[in-house]
Amino acid sequence: MMQFTSSYFRQVLLALCVAFALSSCVISRENVIVLERQGSFTAGGTVISTPGTFDSIADGAFSPADQSTAGQTLHGDHAFVFYQIPVDARPLPLVFWHGYGQSMKTWQTTPDGREGFQNIFLRQRYPVYLLDQPRRGQAGRSTEPTTISAATNDQLWFGIFRLGVGSELYPGVQFSPEPAALDQFYRQMTPDTGPLNIELNTKAVSALFDTIGPGILVTHSHSGGMGWLTALKNDNIMAIASYEPGSGFVFPEGEVPEPIPYVRGALRASAVSLEEFRRLTEIPIVIYYGDNIPNQPVENPGQDQWRASLTMAKAWRDVVNRRGGDVTLVHLPEVGLTGNTHFPMSDLNNLAVAELLSNWLKEKGLD
C-alpha cells in the first residue's frame, strides 16, 4: 500500500492553492486595469521666507510654542496632482479639476461605491490626471492663513448639489437612497486652507499643463470659470469639457451681459480683451448640465442659482460660436438622461454620462 507523508499533502495543498489563484486571475482579468506607470507631483506654487538666521539647535523642534521662524521658508500654493497612465495609452490625457468644496475625490469612487470617471476613462485607455487645486485637499499648504469653519452645513450642500430639498431626495434623482451613500457624500466636502485665489489657481493648473504637455481639461462647477481663464494662459489645453460651470464666464469687452438675478444673489460675468477671448474660439468645448433646473425663477435657491448658470452658459455659448468657436451645450434631460444632480460624474447613471463625453471626444478627433 502507498504511504502518504505530511510533506506530500503539503505539496498537494500548495499546488491546489496556486491553481485556484491562477484560475481566479484568469476569470477576473477582463476587469483589471493595467497601468504603465502612476505617481504624483506638485505644480506651480510660491515660496515665502522670514528674514533672519535659522538656528537648527534652538528652533529645530516642533514642540516650543514660541518657536522662531527666522531664516525659514514655506513652500505652498501649489496644485497636487495624481496621475495614472494605462498601457497602450491614448495620446491626449484627461485632466480632472474639482469644484468648490470638493477635491479630486469627486472623480474617484462614487458615494455609493461604484467607479468614478477616473477608472471609467482609464478603461478607455485615457491617461488621467486628478488635481487638488492650491489650498485644497492634498495641496493644503497655503502661504496665507485662514479660519476653517466647523459650521453644520451638510443640508446646504444637499440642496446646492440638487439631491433634493431639506433631507428628501427629488423623485427619480440619480443618487442612491442608501444612507451610507449620503454619509459618503457629506464626508467628501473639503475646506480651503487659505483664502480662495483664482489667479493663483489658474497659474498652478497652467503649470500642470506646462509639465505634461497637450491635454484635455475636464472641469466641474467652480473650476469651470477658472478653466476658461487657464485656457487663455496655456496653449496646451486642446479642449475643455465642463460639468455644470457655475460662475466665471468671460465675454469680450463690450459684450458682457447684464447680471442674472437668482434667489439671494446675482450671477455676473467678466470681460477680457477680444484678443484674449479669441483663444476660446480655437478649441472645442462641451458643457453639461443635469436635471431639476427650472426654466423660470423659483424660491428654492438650490435650483434657482443653477437656472442662472445655465442661462449664462447659453449666452456664453452663443457669443463664442458667433465668433467662430465650437461650444456644445448639453442639457442632459433633453438627450434622455433624467434625474442628474450637480455632479453627474458621480450619479447612478455616470456610465451613460461618461459615454456622452467619450462620443464627443471621438467626434472632435480628440481620442
Protein language model features and the residues they cover:
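Active-site glycine-rich loops that stabilize anionic/oxyanionic intermediates
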Residues: 98-110
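Gly/Ala-rich beta-loop-alpha elbow adjacent to hydrolase catalytic centers
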Residues: 218-227
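Catalytic active-site module of serine/aspartate enzymes centered on a nucleophile-bearing elbow/loop
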Residues: 339, 343-367
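Conserved alpha/beta-hydrolase
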Residues: 114-140
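Short beta-strand element of the alpha/beta-hydrolase
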Residues: 91-99
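The feature captures the conserved acid-bearing segment of alpha/beta-hydrolase catalytic domains
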Residues: 247-324, 328-330
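N-terminal cap/lid segment of alpha/beta-hydrolase-fold proteins
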Residues: 27-89
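Conserved acidic catalytic loop of the alpha/beta-hydrolase fold
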Residues: 195-216
